From Swiss-Prot:
The keyword Transport is assigned to this record: no
Highest taxon of source: Bacteria
Assembly and oligomerization: Part of the 50S ribosomal subunit; part of the 5S rRNA/L5/L18/L25 subcomplex. Contacts the 5S and 23S rRNAs.
The protein's name: Large ribosomal subunit protein uL18
Membership in a protein family: Belongs to the universal ribosomal protein uL18 family.
GO BP terms in the entry: translation
InterPro entries tied to this protein: Ribosomal_uL18_bac-type, Ribosomal_uL18_bac/euk
Keywords for the protein's UniProt record, in alphabetical order: Ribonucleoprotein, Ribosomal protein, RNA-binding, rRNA-binding
GO MF assignments: 5S rRNA binding; structural constituent of ribosome
Main function: This is one of the proteins that bind and probably mediate the attachment of the 5S RNA into the large ribosomal subunit, where it forms part of the central protuberance.
Biological source species: Tropheryma whipplei (strain Twist) (Whipple's bacillus)
Gene from which this protein is expressed: rplR
One GO cellular component term: cytosolic large ribosomal subunit
Disulfide bridge map: none
Length: 119
């Protein structure tokens, strides 16, 4: 499969997914964006259009860890869950961003669940 068709397939999956889910203030959307090197996670309230908390592998605490990409994604999931719990969010809707639920995307969800966030 060529790179352009893979990217367009991911975009189609994401559009299809976003039709079905949206976040609220009580239960925000946990949006995962993945690049070749980094993972970015945001807890988004779609009603007001605001990001409540965010975390990524580009933060100093996570960058300092001598881990692989999947283990760092797990740490990002734990970090975003801790920050969400600190602002009073107990559960979230998981938005995989059109990516398949495996590897780093699944690790973010597992990390968030381990830290106490219900997804």
């Amino acid at each position: 499969m060529s790179l352009t068709s893979r990217a367009s397939a991911r975009k189609r999956r994401h559009v299809r997914l976003r039709k079905k889910i949206s976040g609220t203030c009580d239960r925000p959307r946990l949006s995962v964006t993945r690049s070749n090197r980094h993972v970015f996670v945001q807890a988004v309230d779609d009603i007001s259009g605001k990001t409540l908390v965010s975390a990524s592998t580009m933060e100093k605490d996570i960058r300092a860890l001598e881990l692989g990409k999947t283990e760092r994604a797990l740490a990002v999931g734990k970090l975003v869950a801790q920050r969400a719990l600190a602002v009073g969010v107990k559960s979230a809707v998981f938005d995989r961003g059109g990516c398949k639920y495996t590897g780093r995307v699944a690790a973010v969800a597992e990390g968030a669940r381990e830290a106490g966030l219900q997804t």
